């Protein structure tokens, strides 16, 4: 066995002395899979070569939203050529439940179905066509029960998946009683389909001793590992999850990915053959949960100048038929019901309503967007009622730096950038001049009306379940100076792997092309937290940084011993390692370490310090820090049709010291457009019987390129490091930009309000579809006729 000899390469050393490392943190490196994505070379689960004997799975879904199952006859399925196995709940060897926190999510329906689209049976066959035909051949009979579909009705009937929860500060009733002005209202916020490009997919290969190799498109490999083990009745060490990349996630693969993996595992163990399940787009949209729709009621007390003195908000989330993650999601909506504003005395109540729809789940922002939309609606309502400028009102109520800086859940708002960001964006977007210009335009334009809004974002970063704020990483250095990297995060296109490679390159001072990242693997880094809550780079980046520092310190100690020098005389820079007067390439040092029996692998670990939250008391510090941003959006509406266009958007967003500005700007742009889609064109529709009607791209409209503002200006806050000890003082960027899209919705309300001379608030439900915009115009036009 031969290894590299530790000889110096003088030319390499001279060249690397001359130029700084080109690929560490702070540089706009391209996405590590960018070329593979555009060329089609990036392999997803469905691209893997088919193994001999591979079985394809297809589900048969419930045809009713609420019914008892009276008969299941799978005999006809076996008459279809190629059908090998049909699964019912009786074929589950372990626990027939995939609830992430509490039981209540049956893998296969037993005696009752709780929503239209619930999986009742699964057929395994030698081809996808045979599996589909087999699933359609089964005979399933029901006794139909009455479904509960409306969140307001569920709230009235106290139909909950979890008890209501309250955040309270001060005496809100007394504050409302003494307020010179009181404003009340209610409205609906729609849900949102994840619409990831790759639908829910899993491939399971059986091994010896009941071991299972699971390839799962999941944001949460450890949870899939745990649930597969429970469903199969085996231990977790017999299940290994492999996840190289997802074709999108957005939260929809945090808990929802486990079901298909578990079904494949049953078939693989039952038949001894590899099993794959890739849901069709229609089945995926019918089976899986969405962003939670919300019903919001509010009552606020306001001083003459618009200052909030008392706020009461009820947030009723439509959770679907089971808990899933709804407890934490509605909690986060409550945490963000203040957004950027000091509420005064406040009571925020969260309701987790149970309905006969798919169990709603995580989605980018995790409830935070719904909470923010509630308070932004309130701000616009106050501005119209009191005749105040919406931006001036918002700034009047911002959190302060020295006082008025405690949230309604009793966390201090630190490193507050709201004033600075708003002032900079107000100037760069020319807000005041455009506001005057738009009012003049609307006064002379009878049919087209323009609207403008500038809204802030203050988003808390951390899992609110504190134990999840931890991560691990594994780094291996080989004797040729190359590095293999594994961590507990998952790549879904957001650039996480690219950033973590840059972090390791920065610590070791080597180029990124020397680092190879491998699939997320529960056999390498165990007990991972989900890649969610904008924590991917914060947690896994810190763990990788820790592992790299351990290895660098080991190398440093070795060189100190070899050269009888102090650690301060050893430096890693630009691919060169200096020890006293001696200079080495990084590969030389790796070879020396091996020859001197220094271990060249290290496990890194990180946990977020200082966060805590007492849920019973409704107080604590659930967030490590806040990310800030603001967006200014201009729209134009057609008052005859309700159609509209986004004309311009100016965005200023805080990412701390950016790890990769190009990726961060991409996340801001994408998050903004996705947020705009949620609040404008993405409408979920159910029939009176509970059938999900918008179950494909023909009926469910995500933003197209024509929906993006023609003039989109994105700027990152410069020269502002995160004061917290995050990875190289960066800030999370996954979720906060999503809420920037609220500015578009507020701008639409501003345009509609102009029809009534800005004297009435249109209070549009979200999404603000052209139909809703037109109805708002007609209502205000009628109300305007009644004005004295």
Residue map of PLM features:
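Glycine-rich loop/linker segments at domain edges
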Residues: 27, 32-40, 166-202, 293-378, ...
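Thiamine diphosphate
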Residues: 247-272, 276-278, 496-504
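Flexible, low-hydrophobicity surface segments
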Residues: 1-164, 182-185, 270
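A glycine- and small-aliphatic-rich helix-loop capping segment at beta-alpha/alpha-beta transitions
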Residues: 220-221, 229-233, 256-267, 293, ...
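Short acidic, glycine/serine/threonine-rich loops at helix termini
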Residues: 96-101, 134-137, 216, 225-227, ...
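Helix-loop-helix junctions that connect adjacent transmembrane helices in secondary transporters/permeases
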Residues: 152-232, 398-482, 693-705, 711-715
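C-terminal catalytic domains of large/alpha subunits in multi-subunit enzymes
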Residues: 2-6, 89-90, 233-238, 268-275, ...
């Amino acid at each position: 066995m031969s290894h590299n000899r530790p000889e110096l390469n003088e030319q390499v050393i001279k060249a690397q002395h001359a130029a700084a490392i080109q690929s560490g943190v702070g540089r706009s490196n391209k996405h590590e899979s960018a070329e593979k994505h555009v060329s089609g070379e990036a392999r997803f689960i469905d691209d893997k070569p088919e193994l001999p004997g591979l079985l394809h799975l297809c589900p048969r879904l419930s045809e009713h939203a609420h019914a008892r199952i009276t008969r299941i006859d799978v005999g006809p399925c076996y008459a279809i050529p190629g059908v090998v196995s049909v699964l019912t709940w009786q074929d589950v060897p372990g626990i027939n439940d995939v609830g992430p926190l509490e039981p209540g999510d049956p893998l296969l329906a037993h005696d009752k179905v709780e929503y239209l689209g619930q999986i009742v049976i699964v057929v395994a066959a030698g081809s996808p066509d045979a599996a589909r035909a087999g699933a359609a051949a089964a005979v399933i009979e029901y006794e139909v029960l009455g479904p509960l579909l409306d969140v307001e009705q569920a709230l009235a009937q106290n139909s909950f998946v979890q008890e209501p929860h309250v955040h309270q500060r001060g005496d809100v009733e007394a504050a409302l009683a003494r307020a010179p002005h009181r404003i009340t209202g209610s409205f609906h916020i729609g849900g949102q389909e994840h619409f990831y490009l790759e639908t829910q997919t899993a491939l399971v290969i059986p091994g010896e001793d009941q071991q299972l190799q699971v390839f799962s498109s999941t944001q949460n490999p450890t949870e899939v590992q745990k649930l597969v083990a429970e469903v199969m009745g085996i231990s977790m060490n017999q299940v290994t999850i492999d996840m190289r990349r997802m074709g999108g996630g957005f939260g929809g693969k945090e808990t929802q990915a486990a079901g298909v993996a578990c079904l494949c595992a049953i078939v693989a163990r039952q038949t001894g053959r590899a099993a794959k399940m890739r849901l069709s787009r229609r089945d995926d949209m019918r089976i899986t949960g969405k962003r939670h729709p919300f019903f919001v009621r509010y009552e606020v007390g306001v001083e003459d100048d618009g200052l909030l003195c008392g706020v009461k908000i009820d947030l009723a989330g439509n959770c679907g038929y089971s808990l899933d993650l709804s407890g934490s999601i509605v909690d986060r909506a409550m945490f963000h019901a203040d957004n950027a504003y000091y509420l005064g005395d406040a009571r925020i109540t969260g309701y987790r309503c149970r309905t006969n729809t798919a169990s709603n789940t995580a989605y980018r922002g995790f409830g935070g967007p719904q909470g923010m939309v509630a308070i932004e609606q309130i701000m616009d309502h106050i501005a119209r009622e009191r005749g105040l400028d919406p931006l001036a009102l918002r700034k009047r109520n911002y959190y302060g730096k020295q006082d008025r800086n405690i949230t309604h859940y009793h966390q201090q708002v630190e490193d507050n950038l709201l004033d600075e960001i708003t002032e900079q964006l107000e100037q760069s977007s020319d807000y005041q001049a455009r506001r005057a210009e738009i009012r003049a335009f609307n006064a002379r334009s009878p049919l087209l009306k323009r609207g403008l809004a500038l809204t802030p974002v203050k988003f808390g970063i951390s899992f609110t379940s504190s134990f999840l704020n931890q991560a691990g990483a594994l780094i291996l250095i080989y004797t040729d100076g190359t590095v293999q990297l594994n961590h507990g995060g998952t790549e879904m296109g957001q650039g996480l792997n690219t950033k973590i490679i840059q972090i390791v390159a920065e610590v070791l001072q080597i180029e990124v092309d020397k680092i190879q990242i491998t699939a997320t693997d529960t056999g390498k880094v165990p007990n991972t937290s989900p890649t969610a809550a904008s924590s991917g780079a914060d947690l896994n980046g810190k763990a990788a940084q820790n592992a790299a520092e351990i290895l660098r310190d080991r190398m440093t100690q070795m060189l100190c011993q070899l050269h009888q020098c102090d650690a301060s005389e050893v430096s890693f820079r630009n691919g060169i390692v200096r020890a006293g007067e001696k200079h080495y390439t990084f590969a030389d040092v790796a070879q020396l370490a091996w020859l001197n029996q220094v271990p060249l692998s290290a496990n890194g670990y990180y946990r977020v310090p200082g966060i805590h939250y007492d849920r019973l008391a409704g107080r604590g510090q659930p967030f490590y820090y806040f990310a800030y941003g603001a967006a200014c959006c201009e729209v134009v509406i057609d008052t005859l049709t309700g159609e509209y266009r986004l004309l311009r958007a100016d965005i200023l967003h805080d990412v701390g010291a950016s790890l990769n500005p190009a990726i961060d700007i991409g996340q801001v742009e994408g998050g903004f457009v996705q947020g705009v889609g949620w609040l404008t064109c993405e409408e979920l529709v159910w029939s009176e019987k509970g059938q999900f009607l918008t179950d494909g791209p023909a009926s469910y409209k995500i933003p197209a390129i024509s929906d993006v503002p023609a003039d989109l200006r994105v700027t990152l806050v410069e020269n502002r490091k995160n004061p917290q000890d995050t990875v190289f003082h960066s800030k999370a960027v996954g979720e906060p930009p999503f809420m920037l899209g609220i500015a578009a919705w507020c701008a639409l309300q501003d345009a509609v309000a102009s029809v009534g001379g800005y004297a009435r608030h249109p209070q549009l439900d979200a999404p603000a579809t052209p139909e809703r915009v037109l109805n708002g115009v007609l209502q205000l036009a009628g109300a305007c006729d009644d004005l004295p």
